[in-house]
Amino acid sequence: MKQFLLANIKLALFAAFALLIVLYHFIGFQTHYGTDDLMYARMANDLMNGNLLLDDHHFAYRWSILGLTALSYQLFGITDLASALPAMVISIITLYLVYAATRQLNTLGTFMALSLFTLTPWMLFHTDKLMPDIYMSLGSLASIVVVNQYRNGKIRKPWIAGLLFSVSIFFAVLSKAAIVLLVPVILFILVSDLLQKKNVRFWVLSTSILALMLIAYLGILYWLTGSALSRVTAAATSNFFNLSTYAQRPASELIGRITYGLPMLFTEHIFMTALMFSILPLLTLGLRDVFRMSDPKMFFSTITIVACLSANFMSTSFDHYIPMLAQPRHFLFLIPLAAIATAPVLYAYFANREFKNRVLLMSAIIALASLFTGNALAMWTYCGVLGVVAVRYFLPPDNKQLVVVSFFLSFACLLLVKPIDDVLVGIRSNYKSQKHLIKSHLIGASDHAVVITNTVQKTFAEYYQEFQTADNPRWITYAEEPRYSFQPDDEIYVLNNSSTQALSALSYFDAPLYSRRIPKSAEPIHAEQGLVLYRVQNREALIREESIMTESNDFETPNSHWSDYSGSVTSQYSLSGAVSCEVPAHGFSASYTLPFSELTTISANVVHLVCSIHIRTEQVGAVEVVLIAEEDGETKLWHSGGGDSFEPSGGNWWRAVKHQEYDLELLSNATLRVYVWNRGGDNIFIDDFKIEVLQ
């Protein structure tokens, strides 16, 4: 066995990383997204039962993920493992292609490529997720690997290479329309080859086979839906374009997106490690040499850079400039390409100190950029990379195997920083607890059981019930509860899970009061940090918020609840009415004042205060809304909300909303002050200052 491993150490490395992908699921699984992924689960279940509708939902046209997931459900039932298996298999196949593309390298080079692919946090996180991005990564990488293998003579027959290439592209098409980002890459290789009169038969066969596949695909769509372009229509009517379009946004956002936006996003999410070194071998070549790709060693570096440029600049729409939504998962297809391109660069550097100035400079740039991301793990990772690179840079050349291996292992350990943190998050996650709670206490409960919860938790529960909505209990969301017709014999449960509430994009204060406070008459069933289940006899037992006081100020007239602002009123800008209140640079606005003693007569011990202010500023990051509780000149509580949470209202106006709860027993003698703090160098303007107190 030992001799076999020594003789096949690269294959053993591949097997070890494949095992890591499997172990990551069983040890570090955190949760489902609860939205897109479980929509795929629902559609896969529909497909398995022959009920999939090709309507205006573009997810229904992603047949690769739906087909493999439906097959998994057919074989193993609808379980978390069955949902994860297809993605894990796809990830391991992609890992194998990375291994195959770097097998000719030194063992350490192959090790580095496998490490960069597997340990990029977003890639590892998605290796067991029911999402199409990993499927598109496989199709993209497979097509490029086929081209490279044919160019290098490892695939000799052009029709075999053309067929493999076409199947790979078509698989990606069936996975996600974002494959359009690979079009510039394919065109780049095609034009390069045709101008050099190379591989012409391969490209003729590839385009012919792919064209036949696409024609057959459009024919099937026409047969199924009555329109060959039904998928295009579904994508055009989806919310994706609304989320991604820059047509109605300030030009500064567009400029930011296509300049520093994506690199900074990649740095913040530790997505840059494989990408950052891939360009370095090309810096000594002329543009003509880069375009010709005459050196096989430069192929993947060239392809990676073209793919990055496409990802950054290419629009996904013909009507408006709509680049791919700036979320790392949409760009996972870059990681395997970059891993293959970067591995020989790092081997050359750590073994022979090649590219030494470029590697050091690039490491320093990314480490510096990480300091501005606000992500401590990104800072640790990239500053650590800079440290390892710097040590190798300043140490005298030493090609001893032990020294080189030490540098490679040190680099790989840095890649583990975020994955280890993710595993710890998964271990601490309450996903298994909430799943057990639902299965043991709610699924199969009384025919009269109704569970009120957040949107994602409801989706989780329906998934656990295998989407058999007729089964008990009935699930409704917080938003549906006010309109739901309860029956007299209904047993009402409230399930509050802070994790799924966050996935539902609900803040602590967005959820109703009865999700935060258990009524005295309720029957507690389960209570732990962030996960609560209780039962009440009727709807009236649910605790609801009611407004007990509202104050507003548009600064048109004096208001005794605010400090004097007569000298700050201006007609230069206003949101409503004729005037607003000006706040000087590095100064404070008029303060709203509320003695808590005025609230002690109410029945509740805790009140919820909502402050809403409209602010006109061009430096929103330099503005804070401050809520301060003072007693006898001493600050008891201090809270603030910065500009990153403000909502744009148009014309440089922003709406700031700040929520805060106060315990009246602790603050009965204190006074609340609310004001705007302008930390910037220019005057700002405020209007429609509103305070509401709820109990």
Residue ranges and their predicted role:
Residues 96, 263-306, 338-351, 361-364, ...:
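Hydrophobic, aromatic-rich transmembrane alpha-helices
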Residues 85-105, 142, 146:
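Transmembrane-helix motifs of polytopic, lipid-linked glycan transferases
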Residues 363-460:
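Membrane-embedded, lumen/periplasm-facing catalytic core of multi-pass transferases
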